[in-house]
A protein has these predicted regions:
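Beta-rich interaction/scaffold domains
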Residues: 4-7, 13-80
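Active-site-proximal alpha-helix that buttresses catalytic centers in soluble enzyme cores
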Residues: 4, 17, 73-265
Length: 265
């Protein structure tokens, strides 16, 4: 056996966890219940307290017990997975908004690096393009907001909270820019929530999702959809190492585009 193989074996043995005791398994089960309790779509007055309690209970576990955490939605990855540096993400939940605001509404992601780069990138771009407006953030997935709050202590507003913040800060002109792909359930719920608050502002505008308005039928394709389709194909061809769609076709390449889907017709 080589010296390198010996080192690998020793390192593996050093990181092998001791079996969890019955007491540790019971503690892990309680943490699983606490995670499941905050894995919900509705916010309540107890949400922040429950998130804090779940994290404190996780931190108190031994490594062996953490490996035993499970539940309907709970797993060791809920708190244990490294998704990047949360301090690089700006939750944009500050007050002192001013009279003009762009509220960027996203489904959200609990992956810190992706959130800062992708969602944060859109928010930063809008802030540069519209310097007369304050840009703020809201997510539509309370499950994700709870995950971020519990694991990292970062508070992100849901839509209701963001609209209340805008009202409290005296915003008069509100533009809501969703990052949703299409007019699905999340977009419909956003419209419903916004309708309840329209009277709180002098001017309110809701932008369309990326793929634009729904046509009368599947044959109606608007300019937004055409542009997105063109850009997707260009990106796929480039990522595949081809100079053009024609070249890819000549070499027998096929590209498959997979979407999340929606029950909306």
């Amino acid at each position: 056996v080589s010296a390198a193989e010996t080192q690998v074996t020793e390192a593996t043995e050093a990181t092998t966890l001791a079996p969890a005791t019955d007491e540790e398994k019971a503690q892990a089960a309680e943490v699983g219940k606490k995670i499941d309790a905050i894995y919900v779509q509705n916010w309540s007055e107890d949400t922040e307290k429950l998130c804090k309690e779940a994290k404190e209970a996780w931190d108190a576990l031994s490594d062996s017990a953490k490996a035993e955490v499970k539940g309907e939605h709970a797993s060791p990855e809920y708190f244990g997975l490294d998704t990047g540096d949360v301090t690089k993400d700006n939750p944009l939940n500050q007050d002192e908004i001013g009279e003009k605001e762009i509220l960027v509404v996203s489904f959200g992601t609990s992956y810190n690096d992706s959130r800062a780069k992708d969602i944060g990138g859109i928010e930063s771009y809008l802030a540069k393009q519209f310097p007369d407006y304050s840009v703020r953030r809201a997510f539509t997935s309370q499950i994700i907001m709870n995950h971020i709050l519990a694991r990292d202590g970062e508070k992100i507003d849901n839509v209701e909270q963001a609209l209340e913040r805008a009202k409290k800060n005296g915003v008069k002109e509100l533009i809501v820019q969703p990052t949703h792909l299409m007019q699905g359930k999340e977009y419909d719920e956003l419209k419903e929530t916004l309708d309840k608050h329209k009277a709180d502002f002098a001017k309110v505008a809701l932008a369309e999702p990326l793929l634009g308005e729904v046509g009368k039928d599947a044959e109606e394709i608007n300019a937004d959809k055409e542009q997105v389709a063109t850009l997707l194909v260009q990106a796929a061809v480039t990522d595949g190492g081809f100079d053009s769609v024609q070249k890819a076709g000549q070499e027998g390449a096929a590209f498959v585009f997979l979407g999340h889907g929606t029950s909306h017709t």
